[in-house]
Regions:
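Short intrinsically disordered, low-complexity coil segments enriched in acidic
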Residues: 1-2, 287
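Thiamine diphosphate
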Residues: 2-153, 296-506
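Glycine-rich ThDP/TPP pyrophosphate-binding loop and its adjacent helix/strand module
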Residues: 57-58, 65, 113, 117-300, ...
Length: 508
């Protein structure tokens, strides 16, 4: 039902307000959630999905799609709204079930590629790190198959993300590796749950990220979609540095009594304040109503996405004819094909094993045996390659200038390593492992838990798993870690006793 309308409101502003109020309506109906960030960041989401990203709502698994990460997972109502409007498999009824058990619209996004949700986010900073892993995957592929693999990693990050240590670890690594396909828009609204950022977060974010080696675009008006689009396109031109776009926004934008305050963050606006916000933004539509012209405008993403995918398929066919060997290699990676007969050969080798040795040495040997059969196996360690035996021999180190290396030097960044590895797994093309000492599993527990929750196939290697590590003292002696890991649902924990069990753990 239309109450009153501002005739001067263009279709883009109308679509943005639709995103705002669909988000507000979801939170109001659930009587819980976070309306503030969606109201402030709606222009960013609109710009990305409607004007920038290469994506096909009717085939969310399109291999060369741009990836989008909502690192501020509490703003999930905005993600569901934009996916619904652009033609993904979300209905208004799904939006009305926001935060309900068993719905498509849980309180924080849960990975489901068929719905357009690339990663599970909620614990702040995790999505930020996941995007770095996705960019590593993209760079590995595009460095060799650039004619058909070429996509960006976009994300909306927030003040809370940037306060988390994992984001610092991942940002530092991304700058070091020159991951130019990362473009993050920082929803800089200056508010956290406790209040103004002046209470706990006064650092100069721009200088910090420049020090990491990022290109930074400062003081961008988060309401100006033309400026946002222009800035993102400028960022795309820099393939040597990840980009951070600092978009100044207002939490709870449009709400007369809550905009710009922490009260807009984590509780419903309520029906009375929602009506005031509608009046303030001259929005005359009823609850969960989508204007017909907005529906038509946003669903244009379907046609444009299908056209882009068709172009890509034609490109793949041309590439297959002109580069059959490279195409076959890439096809095996994209489809995760193993070399035929690999399991039989592995079992034969396992039957020949008799000599006793440390299981970390056995693990290293297993890795190098399996790499011959699994062309998409990559990995590294948190600055403990020699100790954890995690080097793929004769394969080089992945770096800014050598992006074909299969060994990733994560640095002393255990938590970041976990989040980045999850991003590599979520990208969908590589099997990734990462190693450190068992006692340091505590540093990366949140990433391990999210990997299990997301049903990713990330492989975590933990060595030095005994109190027999006496000389290093109690700081390095794992006591509770093994039991702690075994309590995580969906996490398969193997603790092999010998060489054969180690190899078969890897096979499993």
């Amino acid at each position: 039902m239309v109450i009153s309308l501002n005739k001067s409101m263009n279709i883009e502003q109308k679509a943005i307000n639709t995103l705002r109020f669909l988000s507000v309506d979801q939170v109001n109906k659930a009587n819980s959630g976070h309306p503030g960030a969606p109201m402030g960041a709606a222009p960013i989401a609109y710009t990305l999905f409607k004007k920038i990203m290469n994506h096909n709502p009717k085939n969310p698994n399109f291999q060369n799609r741009d990836r989008f990460i909502l690192s501020i997972g509490h703003a999930s109502a905005l993600l569901y709204s934009v996916l619904c409007l652009t033609g993904y498999d979300f209905s208004i009824e799904d939006l009305k079930k926001f935060r309900q058990l068993g719905s498509k619209t849980p309180g924080h996004p849960e990975r489901d590629i068929d719905l357009g949700i690339e990663v599970t986010t909620g614990p702040l900073g995790q999505g930020f790190a996941n995007g770095v892993g996705m960019a590593i995957s993209e760079k590995m592929l595009s460095s060799k198959y650039d004619k058909i693999i070429n996509h960006n990693i976009y994300g909306i990050v927030g003040d809370g993300d940037l306060q988390e240590g994992i984001a610092s670890e991942a940002a530092s690594l991304a700058g070091t590796l020159g991951l130019g396909k990362i473009i993050y828009i920082y929803d800089s609204n200056g508010i956290s749950i406790d209040g103004s950022n002046e209470l706990a977060f006064t650092e100069n974010v721009s200088q910090r990220f420049k020090a990491y080696g990022w290109e930074v675009f400062e003081d961008i008006d988060g309401l100006d979609i033309k400026l946002l689009e222009k800035t993102i396109l400028n960022a795309k031109n820099n393939l040597d540095q990840p980009s951070l776009i600092i978009a100044n926004t207002t939490i709870g934008y449009g709400s007369p009594n809550k905009a710009g305050s922490e009260s807009a963050h984590g509780e419903p606006l309520g029906l009375e304040e929602t009506e005031l916000a509608k009046q303030n933004l001259d929005w005359g539509y009823s609850e969960f109503e989508i204007p017909e012209d907005v529906k038509k405008h946003m669903l244009e993403c379907i046609e444009s996405g299908m056209i882009e995918e068709e172009k890509w398929i034609e490109l793949c066919d041309e590439y297959k004819n002109s580069n059959p060997k490279e195409y076959d290699e890439l096809n095996k990676i994209l489809n995760k094909k193993l070399i035929p007969g690999w399991d039989k050969e592995i079992l034969e080798k396992a039957s020949e094993i008799n000599d006793p040795e440390a299981t970390r040495a056995s693990s290293g040997a297993s890795i190098n045996l399996l790499t011959d059969y699994i062309p998409n196996l990559i990995g590294g360690s948190a600055d403990l390659t020699g100790s954890t035996n995690t080097e793929i021999k004769n394969s080089g180190n992945f770096s800014k200038n050598i992006p074909t290396g299969r060994n990733i030097k994560f640095g002393v960044r255990e938590h970041g390593m976990g989040g980045v590895m999850n991003g590599i797994s979520a990208h969908g093309n590589f099997r990734v492992f990462g190693g450190t000492f068992l006692v340091f599993a505590d540093y990366m527990r949140a990433s391990i838990r999210l990997s299990a929750l997301s049903k990713l196939n990330t492989i975590f290697i933990f060595t030095h798993d005994s109190i027999g590590l006496g000389e290093d003292g109690p700081t390095h002696q794992p006591i509770s870690q093994l039991m702690s890991l075994r309590t995580i649902p969906n996490l398969n924990v193997f603790r092999p006793a010998d060489k054969k069990e180690t190899l078969m753990s890897w096979v499993s």
